[in-house]
């Protein structure tokens, strides 16, 4: 896996802009590239975080340099928060409840607000969702509930909790069958899942067990599922930025995909 060039940590002269968008009682952050784009990534923070967790200089500078150097096609990046504004309990159990219901908010409020603001009607083949840790759990819930909205799924160091907290590790076979059923229930559309974690990540045992169970269903997942493990990779944002540096250029890269 490639490392992020040191110069990508510095401010880029050709930088995109970050806007704050409000909807209801909440707000989110939107990164807009200099040039208009028909591609958009919804990027979800980890447990105890918020919409600012990803949008730090380290990440934004990296994205700016990637686009400026032609490593990454221009894209919009949306950073929402899955917690309610008054939520004080951000334990894993409480966070699990928050992310389970977040997909409804994503569908009914966030996507219409963001894409209405941009003024572009994105299709599922140009719409991706990703997240770190609990954001990864959120990404799996989107797969379970919103295959009509997204084609690209990039869960980072977070397993699927459809069978309960850390269910990917506790109940890998049942989790896999739930994911299979979700594909069928939603009309068996085409999709791509790119899963990344690290060998020393606390999420590795749960996610690894889940992916191995999913690989037993090649007719459903097969080449649509890509799984990477970074040797020595740990559970922090610095490592996740490296995953995104490697994975984002691959998003939206297959011209043969169908809506």
What do the PLM-derived regions correspond to, one by one?
Residues 1-259:
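Non-catalytic cap/lid and distal C-terminal segments of serine-dependent acyl enzymes
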């Amino acid at each position: 896996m490639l490392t992020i060039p040191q110069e990508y940590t510095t401010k880029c002269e050709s930088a995109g802009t970050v806007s704050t968008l409000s909807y209801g009682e909440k707000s989110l952050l939107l990164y807009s590239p200099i040039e208009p784009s028909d591609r958009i990534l919804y990027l979800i923070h980890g447990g105890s975080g918020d919409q600012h967790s990803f949008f730090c200089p380290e990440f934004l500078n990296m994205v700016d340099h990637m686009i400026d150097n032609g490593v990454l096609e221009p894209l919009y990046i949306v950073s929402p928060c899955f917690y309610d504004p008054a939520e004080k309990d951000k334990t894993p159990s409480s966070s699990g409840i928050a992310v389970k219901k977040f997909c409804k908010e994503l569908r009914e409020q966030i996507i219409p607000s963001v894409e209405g603001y941009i003024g572009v009607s994105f299709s599922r083949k140009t719409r991706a969702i990703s997240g770190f840790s609990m954001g990864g759990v959120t990404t799996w819930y989107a797969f379970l509930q919103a295959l009509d909205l997204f084609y690209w799924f990039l869960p980072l160091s977070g397993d699927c909790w459809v069978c309960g907290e850390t269910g990917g590790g506790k109940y890998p076979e049942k989790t896999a069958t739930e994911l299979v059923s979700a594909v069928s229930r939603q009309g068996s559309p085409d999709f791509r899942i790119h899963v990344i974690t690290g060998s020393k990540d606390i999420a590795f045992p749960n996610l690894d067990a889940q992916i191995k169970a999913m690989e037993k269903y090649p007719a459903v997942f097969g080449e649509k599922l890509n799984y990477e493990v970074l040797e020595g990779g740990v559970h922090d944002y610095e490592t996740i930025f490296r995953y995104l540096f490697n994975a984002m250029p691959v998003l939206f890269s297959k011209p043969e995909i169908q809506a």
